[in-house]
Amino acid sequence: MNKPSTRAKSAPAAAKASASLQEPASGFSYSRPFFEELVDRALAHAKRLGATDAGAEASEGCGLSVSVRKGELENVERNRDKSLGVTVYIGHRRGNASTSDFSDKAIEQTVQAAYDIARFTAEDPMAGLPDADDIAPPDTHRDLDLFHPWAIDSEQAARLAMECEAAALKTSRRITNSEGAGVSAQQSHFFSAHTRGFRGGYASSRHSFSVSPIASLPGRNAEMQRDAWYSSERDAAELASPEAVGRYAAQRALSRLGSRKIATTQCPVLFESTLAAGLLGGFVQAVSGGSLYRKSSFLLDSLGKMVFPKHIDILEDPFVLRGKGSSPFDEEGVRVAPRKVVRGGRVQGY
């Protein structure tokens, strides 16, 4: 239901660096240089303790969330959080610890805690940092246009939420109630580094509003159905209008009225887009490293095997501008690139 995107069609050059990677971003309490120094201190202390390898990440997030119900303000919440996470390796033993205290003493205690956990953890032959050859060098970190702070106050957010809910309630006389509407504006930034040579980080944002109307049928056995809809984007300027979100949420609730169960049968099924995306999410989870490593996936050893019809291709593209899952590198600092995960129905990669 989001309005058509106005995103540029061409990606920036690989060597182009984001301004948000270099300068402190508006609305944050901590700068990129401060986070770099924080992470470097943690890594240096880990090496002094005798760690084989170590990684650390400093992050900060802040935002505003407002909820309304039946035209009245229900909740206003401002959040601000920070964290330093440390991972220490002693051979193939790994320990993790984190803190929200950025003092020198707290950093040393956190590194010590991670080190002590690693000392008493069983060895895992797969535990370790990626090879240096796989690391994404800093000059390859693309600007993916992920950071768009939204200068909105609580009154403006409440007004948008009320407009969204009002649009739902006005759609039909059968929309008789609401579980509420909400607006959220969130932003964060981080810096990560480890002893195999990776250094990187960026700022990002995510904004949204949503509504959950209730539809009902009058009568002795009055039926009530609820549904919801939302719009979520990196850039608030690309959000669908509150009215459009409200109307569509109402239409979804109305469409549930009079629904009935069908007898058990075998037949073709057409899934709506939201459910279809959920099916894709199940596949992604099944071919993800964690599930495969724990052998908890139904797609173990599925590489090269048919798991979809021949007309299905699935592309993983980490470089979509303003994409919700886009990133110039993965969680361990490894290079990423567009690739076919499924080609012609066959699994091509995990």
Give names to the regions the model predicted.
Residues 1-337, 343-346:
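Active-site bordering "gate/hinge" segments
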